[in-house]
Design a protein with these regions (language model features):
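Post-DEXD/H (motif II) to motif III coupling segment of the RecA-like Helicase ATP-binding lobe
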Residues: 1-46, 209
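Conserved SF2 helicase motif VI
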Residues: 8-9, 164-188, 205-207
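Helicase-associated low-complexity regulatory tails and linkers flanking the ATPase motor
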Residues: 179, 195-225
């Protein structure tokens, strides 16, 4: 008898069919919110911080380039991360290596950056430090840290423009809701923009949060004021 387990059943039909072919039909489900109620997982709150941007773009890639390269925005985001890190270890997930590098340059010795180019042992050494650290910031690409790592002592999870993929968003939050001896709650920070495509993607994510029973609030921030 073989059991197939997954924490995230895809919503897109083609992704679901690939999973169905590998594992077979779904025979039972237990949601993260149920595990939170049972005390197995840490409770969470999603803080959506929507940076006010007045730039307009005709396609998503041009918009992303602006969101990840505008120096003033990056200064603001780095400042937010440093502030929330005062409450405990922080994991920051980014989509692009360039964005991770820019944030790292703004945080100095308070942060480390890991990506696919970082050797596996070096990545693991940084992850292991979280077990005893009190104010460590790990900046990582979604590709290396969104799944498959165990970091229970993350008290703040920052998602920088996480997009509209159900699997990516929910699996990323899964990095933060693992419990530790000194942790039963995690703050999730969804950093996004008022730009056209980012706003559409946020609408999708808010639907994901509602479905998962993750409480959330939205705050707009004029970073250029």
């Amino acid at each position: 008898l073989r059991w197939g387990l997954t924490g995230t059943i895809p919503k897109e039909p083609f992704e679901f069919q690939a999973l169905h072919c590998s594992l077979g039909p779904v025979i039972n489900q237990l949601s993260a919110s149920e595990l939170q109620e049972k005390g197995v997982l840490a409770n969470c709150h999603v803080n959506v911080v929507q940076l006010i941007d007045h730039a307009e773009f005709t396609n998503y890639q041009s918009e992303l380039k602006y969101l990840f390269e505008e120096k003033g925005r990056l200064d603001t985001i780095a400042g937010l991360v440093i502030e929330v890190n005062k409450t405990g270890n922080t994991l920051v997930l980014v989509d692009r290596i360039s964005a991770g590098t820019e944030l790292l340059n703004r945080m100095g010795d308070e942060a480390v950056f890991v990506s696919g180019a970082t050797k596996a042992k070096a990545r693991q050494d940084e992850y292991d430090e979280v077990a005893t650290a009190t104010g460590k910031i790990i900046i990582a690409t979604y590709g290396v840290a969104a799944v498959g790592i165990n970091l229970p002592r993350i008290f703040n999870l920052v998602l920088l423009e996480p997009g509209k993929s159900f699997v990516r968003v929910i699996q990323s939050i899964g990095r933060g809701i693992r419990k530790a001896e000194d942790k039963d709650h995690v703050q999730i920070w969804d950093i996004t923009s008022t730009c056209r495509f980012a706003k559409r993607h946020l609408t999708k994510r808010k639907a994901f949060y509602r479905e998962a029973n993750y409480p959330f609030s939205v705050e707009k921030l004029d970073w250029n004021a």
